[in-house]
Amino acid sequence: MTRKAVVLYSGGLDSTTCLAIARAEGFEPHAMSFSYGQRHSVELELAKRNARPAGAVEHMVVEFDLRKVGGSALTADIAVPKEGVGDDIPVTYVPARNTIFLSFALGWAEVLGAFDIFIGVNALDYSGYPDCRPEYISAFETMANLATRVGVEGTGRFRIHAPLMRLTKAEIIRKGLALGVDYGLTHSCYDPSPAGVACGLCDSCRLRLKGFAEVGVADPVPYVTGGQGLGGGKETP
């Protein structure tokens, strides 16, 4: 019998690869996306359009507004840094975001009778977010099995899958291409233009472009003028 899995799916490069991996491993993917007041909502629109073509049997979009909390360049009137990937936790970190996302995924998984949750976090080519580290994922998995009926009654055990955790961005892209992922249908930019074109300069764009450059293929999504500085991509006037 095919096992069900909840896949956190933003419409970005990592989560789209994660969805493809879940399918390849024989799971029936139920994709979950979030509209939380993020400034890069073009990513969510792509998720809505592409979840089922990407292999999800069901796609749920959960809506809430983290702009009421603020504290991040993605949800408040704070400039998105464009100087490069730094060593400190950047202002694009959204407080407790992955904890919120995984909690919703856990609730849905329990209702679906699914014991597997996939999340596309990465601890190598990443911006330094604390909720993308392996120790965080391990801790959440422990909590999931302490805080649910399934876990307490012992009728099953939840597992949080983070298959991209120890891969470079280039390795993620290679894996996705091997699985047939169309990266032209993904979006990663934190600060896209009003037309939804990626800036090419934020942390997320830089890491993405670096990955494609290391793979030796062009990033199929367009970038605004000057957004090609790390290789790959196609500029638009």
Swiss-Prot record:
UniProt keyword terms in alphabetical order: ATP-binding, Ligase, Metal-binding, Nucleotide-binding, Queuosine biosynthesis, Zinc
Comment on bound cofactor: Binds 1 zinc ion per subunit.
Family: Belongs to the QueC family.
Stored PANTHER family: 7-CYANO-7-DEAZAGUANINE SYNTHASE
Keyword Nucleotide-binding: yes
Residues that bind ATP: Y9, S10, G11, G12, L13, D14, S15, T16, T17, C18, L19
Enzyme class label: ligase
Taxonomic placement: Bacteria, Pseudomonadati, Thermodesulfobacteriota, Desulfuromonadia, Geobacterales
Cofactor: Zn(2+)
Disulfide-bond pairs as recorded: none
Protein name per the record: 7-cyano-7-deazaguanine synthase
One BP annotation, GO: queuosine biosynthetic process
InterPro entries on file: QueC, Rossmann-like_a/b/a_fold
Binding locations of Zn(2+): C189, C199, C202, C205
Enzyme Commission number(s) from the entry: 6.3.4.20
Record's catalysed reaction(s): 7-carboxy-7-deazaguanine + NH4(+) + ATP = 7-cyano-7-deazaguanine + ADP + phosphate + H2O + H(+)
Species in which this protein is naturally found: Geobacter sulfurreducens (strain ATCC 51573 / DSM 12127 / PCA)
GO terms assigned for molecular function: ATP binding; ligase activity, forming carbon-nitrogen bonds; zinc ion binding
